[in-house]
Amino acid sequence: MGTRYLLVLLLVLLVLGFEVQGAHESQQDETTSSALLTQMQESLYSYWGTARSAAEDLYKKAYPTTMDEKIRDIYSKSTAAVSTYAGIFTDQLLSMLKGDS
């Protein structure tokens, strides 16, 4: 869980760093700026694709598929128990309110 947040933070900082770099370089001449902007854009897309694929691989390795099955099993068992005990509680409450008729 913590590695995902760290990875997201790293990606955000990387994007912000490229924005700052791009803003600094945009103050140069227009002729060199357009070529440099294109190069930076291609570089950014390349880094973004690499980071995205690395993040997907990390997520697939860190999150086991059996976790979904365990969560579903726990949820179904707990809802069955809660509904059973809620039914018992309702019956007891109704019998207390009605009294012995």
UniProtKB/Swiss-Prot annotation:
Keywords, comma-separated and alphabetical: Chylomicron, Glycoprotein, HDL, LDL, Lipid degradation, Lipid metabolism, Lipid transport, Secreted, Sialic acid, Signal, Transport, VLDL
Cellular location(s): Secreted
A Pfam family reported for this protein in Swiss-Prot or TrEMBL: Apo-CII
Location of region: Lipid binding: 66-74
Organism: Canis lupus familiaris
Protein name: Apolipoprotein C-II
Organism classification: Eukaryota, Metazoa, Chordata, Craniata, Vertebrata
PTM remark: Proapolipoprotein C-II is synthesized as a sialic acid containing glycoprotein which is subsequently desialylated prior to its proteolytic processing. Proapolipoprotein C-II, the major form found in plasma undergoes proteolytic cleavage of its N-terminal hexapeptide to generate apolipoprotein C-II, which occurs as the minor form in plasma.
InterPro entries: Apo-CII, ApoC-II_dom_sf
GO cellular component: chylomicron; intermediate-density lipoprotein particle; low-density lipoprotein particle; spherical high-density lipoprotein particle; very-low-density lipoprotein particle
Chief location of this protein within or outside the cell: secreted
Tissues expressing this chain: Highly expressed in the liver. Moderately expressed in the ileum, jejunum and ovary.
Segment forming the signal sequence: 1-22
Region entry Lipoprotein lipase cofactor, spans: 78-101
Family: Belongs to the apolipoprotein C2 family.
One example of a Gene Ontology biological process annotation: chylomicron remodeling
GO molecular function: lipase inhibitor activity; lipid binding; lipoprotein lipase activator activity; phospholipase activator activity; phospholipase binding
Function according to Swiss-Prot or TrEMBL: Component of chylomicrons, very low-density lipoproteins (VLDL), low-density lipoproteins (LDL), and high-density lipoproteins (HDL) in plasma. Plays an important role in lipoprotein metabolism as an activator of lipoprotein lipase. Both proapolipoprotein C-II and apolipoprotein C-II can activate lipoprotein lipase.
